[in-house]
């Protein structure tokens, strides 16, 4: 039986970072855009989603591209302006913590991917997503297992999202001192858990996450008990 192209099922990492995109381009399905997110598992800060379409002749200029989690911070920062310069189009979306709480992480992730693709200044012929399907896109799409290490456009989107979020979390560390956002970027490290317990949650913490909810519940309970223990206030007048 002949194999149809593009495939209709989830595919796994190809033999090279640009193999899949090149095949799609040769099939007349370009430009190919990749979409990826950062901050899905963090208990504070936004979920950041980026979409990026790379030109077929720009791969050599971005030879260091890889899954952003495998790159050093220095390499990511070096790649960020290069991706912005050489991309056909890119768009970064920030989903705030309150929206993550309201929608749930997965639904917020899907919505962020839709917004990121819709925000591209160049309409892609095909979209590759990292790991799971993105329903509701206006163009054909395909999920790629380990996509940020399998397709250059997804790797580029991963770097854009990661650097954008990291920079925001460093700024947030100044806005909400004491939590250590510049270090752990909102993830549930031991230091973050200790700070959260001591300070209580700030407006950027995700109340839908159980560790934040537990601290918030304890803080609210302690505040209620303190109010109940306060003596009656003196009042002027007759009674």
UniProtKB/Swiss-Prot annotation:
Region (Disordered): 217-239
UniProt GO MF annotations: manganese ion binding; RNA binding; RNA-DNA hybrid ribonuclease activity
CDD domains on file: RNase_HII_bacteria_HII_like
Pfam families tied to this protein: RNase_HII
Subcellular location: Cytoplasm
GO cellular component: cytoplasm; ribonuclease H2 complex
UniProt cofactor(s): Mn(2+); Mg(2+)
Cofactor note as given: Manganese or magnesium. Binds 1 divalent metal ion per monomer in the absence of substrate. May bind a second metal ion after substrate binding.
Binding sites annotated in the UniProt record for a divalent metal cation: 36-37, 130
PROSITE patterns, per database record: RNASE_H_2
Domain RNase H type-2: residue ranges: 30-221
Biased composition (Basic and acidic residues): 225-239
The keyword Transmembrane helix appears for this protein: no
EC number: 3.1.26.4
GO biological process, one term: DNA replication, removal of RNA primer
SUPFAM superfamilies, per the entry: Ribonuclease H-like (SSF53098)
Keyword list, A-Z: Cytoplasm, Endonuclease, Hydrolase, Manganese, Metal-binding, Nuclease
Organism: Mycobacterium ulcerans (strain Agy99)
Name of protein: Ribonuclease HII
Name of the coding gene: rnhB
Reactions it catalyzes: Endonucleolytic cleavage to 5'-phosphomonoester
Annotated function: Endonuclease that specifically degrades the RNA of RNA-DNA hybrids.
Enzyme class: hydrolase
InterPro entries linked to this entry: RNase_HII (IPR022898), RNase_HII/HIII (IPR001352), RNase_HII/HIII_dom (IPR024567), RNaseH-like_sf (IPR012337), RNaseH_sf (IPR036397)
